Structure formats: C-alpha cells, structure tokens
Swiss-Prot record:
All residue ranges annotated as the Carrier domain in the record: 595-672
Protein name per its UniProtKB record: Nonribosomal peptide synthetase atqA
Similarity remark: Belongs to the NRP synthetase family.
Organism of provenance: Aspergillus terreus (strain NIH 2624 / FGSC A1156)
Alphabetically ordered keywords of this record: Phosphopantetheine, Phosphoprotein, Transferase
C-alpha cells in the first residue's frame, strides 16, 4: 500500500490505489481525531405530525467525546463496568445509542448494542432470549431508559438494569471525576452485535477495532466517492451494523458529519428521505429494495408535492442490500433520480452480514450491468479489497464452476473470527481452512459477479427483517381461527420479480364448506390480520385440500415441498378459486365512494396498505381489519391532512374511532362544520369479523379505547366492540356524561342496538370493570344472559381510590397510560403539577409535562396540548363521578384478570388479591374466578404481554361457553 498523506484534521487521504491508511489503529482514537474537527451529528426527532420539517439536534464530535468521557468516568467511579466485559446498551433512538456506546467503550468494557426490536411478543420467548443473553454475556449490566425497562423487569434477576436518567453526571459536577484514559489495541472488541432479534437464538458477534478499520478501508476503496467530505446518513437503528459500522463509525473515521434519522420519518413518506439527502448534500446512505419500490410508485403516481423544489442528488451513492433488488425497480428509478443530478448507476447492491461489518461485496454498476444481461434481480458484484469469496459445491467436492450453485464462503480482514462465548456456533460457521460459511446458496456469473440463489435456512426475509416460519405457524395455531383446521398451517417466504420484498405465504386446511364464501372470507381476514401484526406485511393466503398437505409419520408438514409446489404453480387453480370466492363475498359488502373526498381517502388507504386492485376494499371497510400498523395509521393520517388541506387536522385517535374512508370523511365534515350535525356514538368497532358472540370492552378511566387495539388483533373468532366516553368531540357540542347512571344506560342501549339478543360477553379494564359489572347486572335484571363478565384488575370497592384521583393524579396517569413517560418519572413531577393546578394553570401543566415526555411518542399520537387538556378533564370528570360509588346487587359469575397492582394501592399480588379483589365474592352468585396475567396495571395490554393475555382471554371465553 502506498504511503498516504495525513490531513491536518487527523484523518487519511486516499492513496493512488484507492486504499487509505489511517493514522490510528482503533475507533477511540478515530473519535479523538474527529473531535478536533468541526464535524458532528445531526439527529432528527421522529416526525409523525404531517409537517415536512422536524427538529434536529446538533452534536459535534467534540461534544460527543466530552459527554462520553464524563459518563465513562461516572461508570468507573461507581465500579459498574469491568474491562473487556460486555455491557448491554438498550435504546430506541440514535442519540442515546451513540452516547452510551462511547460511554461504555471508554471504560474499557464492550458495548453490546440492542433495541426494542430484539424482543418477541411472546413472554416465554422474551424470557428465553434474556436467559440466553445472561448466559452468553455472563450476566451483563444493561443500560437503558426507564421507559424501556419493562421486558427486563418482568424477568428480574437475569440482567441488572440501570437507567440512563440515573447515570447522567450532575450539572454541578459533584459526581465528576477524571475522564478515563483508554488506548485499545487493534484486536480488542469495539462492539458486540447480535445476529438476530426476536427470532431464533441470538449469536453475539465480536467486532474488533482492526476489523472495523479494515472494512472501512475496503468500502472506501470501492466507492471512490465524488464528494468524499459530504455527510453520511442513516435511518437504520443503531443495533444494526448498517448504522453502527456502516454510518456512525464510518463517518467518524472518515472525518465527515453524519445525519441520523428515525426510521418512521423515512418509512411514512420516502420522499422525505430524498429531501434530507439533498438538504445535507449526503454522499452515502443505505436503503433496501422495498423503499426504492415505494419511491418509484410515488413518482409514477405523481405524488411529488412534498419534494423540495431545489432537490440536488449530485453527491449521492446509494448502498442497498438486506434483500434482493429488482432490476425493473432500479432501472425505473435511475432516470428519475438522474433528473435531480444523481450519477449513473447510483444503486450499489451489496452482500453483507453482521459478521462482515455490513457490505463487503459490491456491485458498482447497477442497473447497467444487470440490464445488459437481462437479470430479474441485481447481482451483488465483487469483493472489496481485503475480502475474498468462493462457491463450494453442494456435495462438498471442491469449488464450484462459474454459474454453478453452491455454498457462499468468504474470508478476509473484515470478516469476524468467531462468535462470543459460543464455540459450537463458531465451529459450525467456519470451514476446515478457515473460510466463513454465510449460510447462503449462490453462484458467480461469467463476469465475476455474485448472485444469491436461496438460503440454507428457512428464515423469511421481509423488508430486511427476518422471521422464523415456525413462530408464525405457532401464532396462527394459538389464535384458534374459525374456519381453519388446527395443526394444518404452513408459513414460508416467497417472492417473484414483481414483488418489492418477500411475502409470507400461508397455506392452510379449511374447516368450512367450500361454498361458504363468508366463512372463507372471515378465515382469510383473520389470518391476514394476525400475520400483518407480526410482520407488518400482508401475507399471501392459499387454502388447500387435505391431500395436498400430507403429514409425515411424525405428524409434520414438509415446508420445503409445499413451498416448491406453490412456486411451481401447482396450487395456482386453488389460489385463483379462492380469490374469486373472496371477490364474490366482498361484492356483497363493498361500499363505493359517495364524494370526491371519500374517493381521495380511499385511494390513500389503498396505496398505504398496498391493497391490490383485485381486492375490492371499499369505503365502509375498516382499516384495522386489513392489519394496519400504527405506522400505517400515522401515514394515512398525514396524507389525508396534507392532500385535503384540512383546517382541523385528523389525530391518531380519529384513525381508530372512524377507521373507514367514509367514517373519516364524516369526521372531517363534522369538525369543519360542513357535515350533518354530530351525533355521539359510544361504540368503536375494533374487529368486525367472526361468528362467535361479540366481545364488548369498556374503557378505563381515561375514557379512550387505544389500549384495546393490540388486543383486538389477537381476537379473530368474534367481533370486538369497545365503548368510548362522551365529551371528546367538544368542538361539535358533545358534552361529558353527568352521572354514572347515564354511562351505564347509554352503553347498555348501544350494546342492545348492535346485539339485540344474548348471550353477552363484556369486560372492563380498570375503571371499566365497574361499568361492565353494572351493565351485566342490568342485562340480567332484564332477563338477558351474560355468560362472561370480566373485571380486569379492579376491585368492587373503589370510591376511596377515586377520591385520591385529583386532577394532578389524572394527568400523571394519562401520560404514562399512553406511554409518554414511565410511572416513576411521572410521579416525580407531581409537586409542580399540583402547584400549577392550584393556580388554575392546567394548560401550562400539560405543557410542562410535555417537556419531560417522549417526543417521538407525542408526535406519533398526533394530539395537541389542548386535546390532552380536554382528555385529562374528561378523565377527571369520569372518575369524579365514582367518588360515592357503592357496589350493590350481583351477577351470575365474574372473571377477574389479575396484574401487578399500582404501587400506591398494594405492595404485592397476594396483598392485592386477598385484600381487595377478593371482595368481589359478595357480588357474584356462582363464584369468582381469578386469572393471573403478565405485566402491571397499566402495562398488561402492551405489545410484550398482549399475546398471552389474549390466549388467557380466549380460554376463559371458551370455558364460559361463548
């Protein structure tokens, strides 16, 4: 390697052969060098409000180093870290991840980067994952925010957790000490990265300083950036090498700035990615094929209003990977981006893994190379300097010939040397002569370019996120879907060139009559909703005959054979017949747009949820029934607000309460004063499908139904309705309830209007448990049968607690109930809130608490400060009506779901049940059943607990005969 000239900023200049020689041999010294420049980090906050700009935090590399040094000194002074021992850094945002990555590294410990995505929705899997980390990393310390501690606290003792908030250096410097002096060797570990999140057993990959710098030298040599001093940008989470190594460390080592953007900002509106690339003159960023496909569709549809007028992409170098790139997408987008100055062959498909520090094999000529050879999918190019690849024959007899399919193996300085504390996995991962087995099947074409051609493992890869098929099978089994035969589900990933990414194919054996279109529709809708919730994608569902799904002598379906048969077209006739039957049924339900506004909103919904034209989704179909995620709801909300230029914009709660194109249109008309007079309807339809007895849910004291949305996705066999309190639409003249009797009678009347005959099933969460009891009591008094009445973590005697819930308590409860802050943090603000409330400054109290809330969650909810004030006042009014409530009378039976009590109410579950919940026995004729569920009073329906909660609920409903 020729000698390079070291620039005055301490960074290296490319030599004549394209390689660089850095003046440091570890990333700590790289940060110290970067701290002597004026470069730094531009970190954006989550934007879900619909505006085109979001606030950004500017942190120079000098400030990053100083903050990390102060934190490291504090960690060392408290003896919290040990040199060369892992410390888990668990964060949901880039700023925390960066600061605490360096804080841990500067103590000499090994930062292990994780995020909320590593946790399964299944409690058993979460515990298994944490136990595995406990063993693999030798009981590591975990640093995180209080708001993210839930999964760790539910498995207390596996990992010692400390909150970032409790570790920040004192403003007065009282806990300050000298910054640590650390000089890592090249072979020291710079980070531990996990190979998988919630699926499978995670392997910890040690990435050394030498490996990082070798990888960055190779990446730099391949790219030959036209604007080498321009910033890098990432919207990927920091627990992925595509950000930590390929952007964050890369930018620091290169001595350039970096832009960190939350994924939601890009995924909600991909056009904003182009705007950010232009505004910051970004040279290097990463995006997968599905995002390019979304961009192309937006351009093709002419939806470019949000693009900057002076868009300039001249500096751009687009790394892409994680899934195969469709050449038609790249070729279609290339001339569009070129109009804004993007260079030819702007797409750089690559092959990379955690074990290779992200991309290590690059195609520098996409789409031209692959267009000339008529490829459907982009090739992955050739190895960067310092890396070699080979294809080994499937029979193990040696190296494959060009074009011959085999096992991809790689070696080189940028490749890791083995998994942390896992000798078995390490032995399996390397050949006898030391080459790394990637686990991919591939071939090399005549031009020397790599092509992937399948995987030796069964992972489903959707938008770069991997899922285990057997976990999806299990989720479908657990859901007990009407119309589907138990043990006859088979999930796998499949893809054609026309698809942006892999999709989950679900093959199942129907339990309905072939001519029953309604039952077929309900079964398919349930499958779609469930898989969409787990994978954030719409599955391909195909019902088969029993003879098409033979089982082995051990009772197993052959996933490989069924996948091969589907992809060979053997089930095409069944799929076509199924689609025709679904269309027939939808034709009987479909609602056509009655106005231009309805047509616009329907079009936005169809585009966001990518509902095919063949699917007759109409204006009366619920967004929620299509498996829409919270991100989908936010995206639809933003686009409707923007395209219809609404004076009073929609909020996230509107998306839930008016979840059809027609409902949203009526909501807009009501709030703008142009529609018919608003009429309060207490019923929110969370899940319209299924033939079993409907489940009615009563809101907690906050009056809203947001808490039930995740649960409704898991209830597939019956309609799910929820009651929403009166008074939220104050602008339309809607006034709050004035008495509990009005609440009981209003909800009972609405219930009878939708379901005139029993048997009935009703449950209430917290405060709603009391309301459910009173409604059930009235129904029984009128001769109706109530087979299921549920109180979810509420005792019968509540007036003492209601008297404690003054206005300041209500605002505290609301803010941690909707995840704006955790309970412990919320209560630290009680004195200030009491002071503001005494002064009659309630709106100021909301604004004060907002300053201490999670800004990303605030934006996601999309509500104004004034709306929160209305909400708190309604909650206070609702609970104030119960200060003199005394239970009386009785119901036939009651099921009490028991979660951890509020800390202000009881210390333990035993005390909670025996001291307070047991009093229900005086108001139930045939006995009370208690069912313990995971989580605490305000968390038992959160994503990490809701799957098992739903499983318990389904069991109880079955036992009660509904």
């Amino acid at each position: 390697m020729t000698r390079t000239e070291i620039l005055s900023n301490g960074h290296a200049e490319p030599a004549s052969n394209g390689m660089v020689q850095y003046p440091f041999d570890n990333v700590v010294d790289a940060l110290r060098a970067a701290a002597n420049t004026t470069e730094g980090i531009i970190a954006y906050q989550t934007n879900n409000s619909g505006s085109e700009t979001t606030p950004a935090q500017h942190i120079s590399y000098k400030e990053l180093l100083r903050t990390a040094e102060a934190n490291a000194a504090l960690l060392q002074s408290k003896h919290l870290t040990t040199p060369k021992q892992p410390v888990v850094v668990h964060s949901d945002n880039a700023v925390d991840s960066m600061i605490w990555y360096w804080s841990v590294l500067l103590t000499g410990a090994i930062p292990t980067m994780t995020g909320p995505g590593m946790f399964s929705q299944d409690a058993v899997e979460r515990k298994k994952h944490l136990l595995h980390l406990h063993r693999t990393l030798d009981a590591p310390l975990c640093l995180t925010r209080r708001a993210l501690m839930g999964p760790f606290n539910e498995n207390a003792g596996l990992l010692q957790c400390l909150a970032f908030e409790d570790l920040s250096p004192s403003p007065d410097g009282s806990n300050a000490s000298l910054p640590p002096s650390i000089n890592p060797s090249p072979m020291d570990v710079a980070a531990l990265m996990l190979t998988s999140g919630s699926s499978g057993t995670a392997k910890a990959v040690p990435i050394t300083h030498q490996q990082v710098l070798a990888a960055l030298r190779g990446k730099t040599a391949v790219a030959q950036l036209s604007h080498p001093t321009s910033p890098f940008l990432s919207w990927v989470h920091m627990d992925h090498v595509a950000n930590l190594v390929h952007c964050h460390l890369f930018a620091i080592v290169a001595g350039v700035s970096q832009v960190q953007v939350p994924a939601a900002n890009v995924l909600v509106d991909p056009m904003q990615l182009l705007n950010l690339l232009s505004r910051h003159r970004v040279s290097r960023t990463f995006a997968p094929n599905f995002l390019f496909a979304k961009l192309r569709r937006q351009f093709d549809a002419g939806r470019t209003d949000s693009l900057d007028a002076d868009l300039n992409l001249a500096a751009l170098y687009l790394d892409t990977g994680g899934e195969a790139n469709v050449i038609d997408v790249c070729a279609g987008l290339q001339p569009i981006l070129a109009r804004y100055g993007a260079p030819a062959d702007v797409f750089k498909p690559s092959f990379g893994m955690t074990e290779t520090c992200a991309g290590c094999i690059f195609n520098s000529h996409c789409p031209s190379y692959d267009q000339a050879r008529l490829h459907e999918f982009a090739s992955l190019g050739t190895p960067m300097p310092g890396v070699r690849m080979r294809i080994s024959r499937l029979d193990g007899s040696g190296e494959a010939a060009p074009g011959e399919r085999g096992h991809l193996e790689i070696t080189g300085e940028a490749i890791f040397h083995g998994y942390y504390n896992n000798p078995t996995a390490t032995a399996d991962a390397f050949t006898a002569d030391g080459w790394f087995r990637t686990g991919d099947l591939a071939y090399i074409d005549a031009g020397g370019h790599l092509h992937l051609d399948g995987r030796t493992k069964e992972m489903v890869n959707i938008n770069g996120v991997k899922y285990l098929p057997h976990e999806l099978d299990a989720a479908l089994e657990q859901a007990e879907i009407p119309g589907a035969t138990p043990t006859y589900f088979c999930c796998f990933g499949t893809r054609t060139a026309a698809m942006d990414t892999e999709v989950v194919a679900v093959l199942y054996l129907p339990a309905y009559d072939e001519a029953d279109d309604a039952a077929r529709f309900d079964a398919q809708s349930s499958i779609i909703r469930l898989i969409s919730m787990y994978t954030h994608s719409r599955p391909r569902v195909v019902p088969l005959r029993r003879e098409d799904m033979p089982k082995t002598t051990l009772g197993k379906l052959s996933r490989a054979k069924l996948q091969a048969a589907l992809e060979a077209g053997q089930f095409a006739a069944y799929e076509a017949a199924n689609e025709a039957a679904i269309r027939r049924h939808r034709d009987t339900m479909r609602g056509e747009p009655a106005s231009a506004e309805e047509a616009t909103i329907l079009s936005i919904i169809r585009e966001q949820l990518e509902i095919p034209e063949a699917d007759d989704f109409g204006v009366t179909d619920s967004i929620l029934s299509m498996g829409a995620t919270s991100m989908d709801l936010v995206a639809i909300m933003q686009r409707v607000n923007r395209q219809l230029q609404l004076r009073k914009t929609l909020a996230l709660t509107d998306m839930l309460n008016y979840a059809t194109a027609r409902g949203l249109c009526q909501r807009i008309a009501a709030t703008s004063g142009t529609g018919r007079k608003h009429v309060y309807d207490p019923v929110v339809v969370l899940q319209p499908h299924g033939r079993k007895t409907p489940l009615w849910l009563v809101h907690p004291g906050v009056g809203e139904v947001l808490v039930f949305v995740n649960l409704a996705h898991h209830i597939t066999d019956r309609p799910v309705y929820a009651f929403r309190a009166k008074g939220f639409n104050a602008a339309e003249g809607e006034t709050p309830f004035t008495s509990l009797e009005e609440v009981f009678e209003t909800y009972k009347a609405a219930m009878k209007a939708r379901q005139p005959q029993g048997p009935y099933a009703i449950a209430g969460y917290s405060f709603g448990g009391m309301v459910a009891f009173e409604i059930a009591k009235r129904l029984e008094a009128e001769g109706d049968e109530v087979r299921y009445c549920g109180s979810w973590n509420l005792p019968p005697h509540i007036k003492w607690r209601m008297k404690q819930l003054l206005w300041d308590e209500c605002i505290i409860h609301l803010f941690y109930f909707v995840d704006l802050m955790d309970e412990e943090t919320a209560y630290t603000h009680k004195p200030k809130l009491c002071e503001l409330e005494r002064q009659g400054r309630r709106l100021e109290a909301v604004r004060y608490l907002r300053q201490h809330s999670n800004p990303a969650r605030w934006d996601e909810l999309g509500l104004s400060e004034e709306y929160y004030l209305l909400w708190v006042n309604l909650a206070s009014n609702m609970q104030g009506m119960a200060t003199e409530y005394e239970p009386s009378g009785n119901v036939k039976h009651l099921d009490v779901f028991v979660a951890d009590p509020l800390t202000h109410v009881a210390r333990t579950r035993e005390e909670w049940v025996n001291g307070l919940l047991a009093a229900w026995k005086d108001f139930v004729r045939e006995g009370v059943r208690y069912h313990h569920v995971e989580g605490a009073h305000y968390t038992m329906l959160k994503p990490e607990y809701v799957a098992n909660f739903a499983k318990t609920l389904r069991t109880v409903l079955r036992e009660r005969g509904v």
